[in-house]
Amino acid sequence: MKKLNFFTASPEMKSEYCAQVVKIGELKPIEGSDYLAQVIISGTSMVIRKDEFKTGDYAIYCKNETALNPDFLSLNNLYEVGEFMRNANREKVIELQENIYKYNSKVVRTEEDLMHIKELEDRLKSLCGFFNKHGRVKMINLRKVPSFGFLIKLDTLANWKPQVKDIDLSEYILNEEMGIGMDFDTVCGEKFIQVYIPPIKERPARNSQKREKKRQKKVERFERISKEDFKFHYDTQSLNSNIWRIEPTDNVVISKKLHGTSFITANIPVKVPIKLSFYNKFINWVYKVSTRFVNYLSAKVVQNYKVEYGNVYSSRSVIKNQFINEKVTSGFYKTDVWGDINEIIKPYIDKGMTIYGEICGYLTGSDKMIQKGYDYGCKIGENFFMPYRITTTNEDGTKREWEVTEVYDWTVKLISEHPELKDKIQPITILYNGSLSNLYPDISIQNHWHENVLEAMKNDKKHFYMECNDPVCKNKVPYEGIVLRKNEDPIAEAFKLKTLAFFKREKANIDAGEVDMEMSNSTEGNELELIN
């Protein structure tokens, strides 16, 4: 079938929590199992059944820690036995349960009765899936092999949306070698997948998690800021799904990824209110509401502001300045940790400069950590700011994205000139700067280089501390991972690679109903009806 827009990405879609068209690669045997196999999908380990998928098949991969559409799960009978009433085949299950009850209610059960009960119970299980009522996709271990995500055939999706039945999935593949295709969260106009958030009794005030364009629309609502002058940070993509974008000879910089909260601070042109006389206020009001005498009144209008450079600061997606965003709340942490850091660094921000970074440690003056367990060596009640990105805009409008090494040099110079800042500001930790072919010279460029270099990076303890505990934290917590950027990249982008140990800890926290700010920010705007 001709390629149409059956699969689309909503404005709030986050690539880390969505579906993806994929091509199945090599099936690797799993010790002790004749019917299970491991396959690397989008750079991530998956366990599949050999009788369901084979090398070269095209499929749809639902990424880890997502929630799937309830109607999709129902029509495919994917809810677990305990939630069978949500499945389309509920009447068959009820019939089997009644037969099982008849055998179990006998005063005396024969050996043959027990065999029948076992057969009926096995049949009942086969009619149901393994999803709980929330439709959560989560990591599981099968035969000691981690399996991230959920893999489905096109026919399974077509049970929910018949329009997609004859789609040629190969047309949606972006990189044939890696078997990586397009990301999407919407099928035929209906939301299929979204980030999973554990149900909690009292949810903290949520900031927006709209993707970059939607976040940026918020700036337009604040008349005192130009949307061209203030930019929220772009989304950091997963290296697993984007390793194919990196060439062996690309000059890259790899830095340590910190587990904190995002912070943006800028010194940009803002509109500062001017106190007007009653007469001028009246003229301005009339001009605003009147549709007549526009030409006459417009000549009388007096600007109620002047433009000058001023400080604007925000979390990942919410402008915090009260004078700009009058409806701002204290947010996820119930305190303005961003304002605390902003007061420290704003005197050193040049005109036209925007600084992006991570705040880590504890909430100021509190024994509560910004991210549970991740103290990063801070004393109780203390924190620090690590800049990882800087942009500048000259008065003529020329914009420049700084290299990571320049961000590092700027931070080091700032601390050197102002030693009193050394406990509050830290430079980005650069772990490697160069090409990946030089970092891993033994990996052949001609034979599956992307897959092999990604696997090497995932297990690189020497350079990147992967799968180790974080060496800086006093608590024993897993190292989160790394961030890769291309040097002199014409596109503002970065790619993250998290450790398996971090994913496991994240899963355990979600199982316990705990959610951090990054995931909390990924809920607003989603359209799936979450089942309580």
Regions found by a protein language model. Name each.
Residues K2-N532:
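Core nucleotide-handling region used for phosphoryl-transfer chemistry
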